[in-house]
A protein has these predicted regions:
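Short, positively charged
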Residues: 1-14, 320-326, 379-384
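Short, conserved catalytic-motif segment at the N-terminal edge
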Residues: 2-59, 95-96, 228, 364-365, ...
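Hydrophobic (often cysteine-bearing) scaffold residues that line and stabilize catalytic clefts
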Residues: 4, 8, 59, 63, ...
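Short active-site loop at a secondary-structure junction
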Residues: 17-27, 46-110, 148-160, 238-241
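Short loop/turn microsegments at loop-to-beta-strand junctions
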Residues: 22-24, 35, 331, 339-342
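Residue-level signal for well-ordered, solvent-exposed loop/turn and beta-edge residues enriched
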Residues: 33-34, 79, 351
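Short, surface-exposed loop or secondary-structure junction motifs
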Residues: 40, 44, 97-330
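Structured C-terminal helix/loop/strand segments within mature extracytoplasmic catalytic/sensor domains
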Residues: 334-384
Length: 384
């Protein structure tokens, strides 16, 4: 990189100084070289714990590409298929409920591209959280969720879909024995270790929880089911948003999908498929499942004409992005998490960037003043 990344570092430092975010980690790499690894502020405001390389961050929905990678590893092994009917693996997901034949048409590819017609969360999402339901109850509820439109027609971001993907992994990798979610957790964590990720936890123990950054501005403060922070939430291991990871390991994971990286755990074909545009339909109209949308959905924003996705990863595809910048290549892929986490990479430049914070996205700090897009612009401007 011929330019300096000092301006990108200064941008994040300024957000800390201004009180925009309590703590942050910024990492940038190119090829095998880590160009920036900086930590600022506090990981836990109440305990005055500083953010350090040992901090475990709630990466929220960046968990989804991990689940997608686990599914693709099963495809590599001949256990699962992208385009077979979902009901072939999950027979509970059968029959139509006044939905025409839509349910029978849903495939794992639809789930991985958020084009299945399933809503963001189940109808019973809050009720289950309030009664401290186990993760298995969430998965069971997903089997009965409505398919709101013909699969492939529109984009509707769906945690339900990735929960079903994880269930497919658990049933296939577990050989039909034992609890599928246990098999999913083992398989996904083994895959991460094979990719070089050493400190990632679905079910952090008491010692590990001492290192977790406390997420501010969740909108659920003080509730015993608060996202990211509550003892209950940390016991769920949600495959769509429940991982706690050190920042360097997030960088390792996203970098694993760049060309030239070696992996025996996940084939080059699988990794390429995940970061290649598989679908780019328009957003579903705001009238579709408005009460079951993701917490970062903004109903005041007009629907997008194209929403490009790979398999588990969002692909910029030349469209505007809140976090992948204004001048990055169309092939850039990434994901963000509601906890205030961002990871993206540019295959053409061999570049990867990770910003982890502990202020929730739904406070809208990343999109105010286009903060995270500006950060990506600063990073891209430093390229040769």
């Amino acid at each position: 990189m011929s330019g300096s990344l000092d301006s990108a570092v200064s941008l994040v430092a300024g957000w800390i100084d201004e009180g925009v975010i309590p703590g942050a980690a910024l990492l940038v790499s190119r090829g095998d070289d880590v160009l920036v690894e900086r930590y600022w502020g506090v990981a836990d405001m109440s305990r005055k714990v500083p953010a350090t390389p040992n901090t475990l961050w709630s990466i929220a929905s960046i968990t989804k590409p991990v689940t997608a990678a686990a599914f693709m590893a099963c495809v590599d092994r001949g256990l699962l298929s992208l385009d077979a009917p979902l009901s072939g693996v999950l027979p509970e997901f059968t029959g139509d409920r006044g939905e025409r034949p839509w349910r029978r048409d849903v495939t794992p590819r639809h789930l991985l591209t958020h084009t299945s017609g399933l809503a963001g969360f189940s109808r019973d999402n809050l009720a289950m959280r309030k009664r401290h339901a186990p993760v298995d109850d969430f998965i069971a509820s997903f089997m009965d969720e409505d398919v709101h439109f013909q699969p492939g027609r529109w984009h509707l971001y769906s945690s339900v879909g990735l929960g079903l993907i994880a269930e497919c992994v658990g049933r296939s990798a577990g050989g039909g024995k034992g609890r599928p979610m246990d098999a999913y957790w083992r398989f996904a964590l083994d895959l991460l270790r094979d990719l070089g990720v050493n400190d990632a936890f679905f079910l952090p123990d008491d010692d590990q929880q001492q290192h977790i950054a406390w997420v501010e501005s969740t909108g659920q403060e003080g509730l015993d089911w608060e996202i990211g922070n509550s003892k209950y939430f940390r016991s769920l291991g949600f495959p769509w948003g429940g991982l706690y990871v050190r920042a360097r390991d997030v960088l390792t994971f996203v970098s694993a999908f760049l060309p030239g990286k070696e992996s025996e755990a996940l084939s080059a074909a699988a990794r390429k498929a995940m970061i290649t545009q598989n679908a780019a339909p328009p957003d579903a109209p705001a009238s579709v499942a408005p009460t079951q949308r993701d917490v970062t959905w903004d109903p005041t924003r007009p629907p997008r004409a194209r929403v490009p996705w790979g398999l588990g990863w969002e692909v910029r595809g030349g469209e505007a992005s809140d976090y992948m910048g204004d001048q990055s290549h169309a092939t850039v892929f990434g994901h963000y998490g509601a906890s205030g986490s961002i990871a993206w990479a540019d295959p053409e430049e061999g570049l990867a960037a990770v910003l982890l914070t502990n202020r929730a996205w739904q406070s809208w700090w990343p999109v105010h003043e286009r903060r995270t897009a500006r950060l990506a612009n600063e990073i891209m401007a430093a390229l040769d």
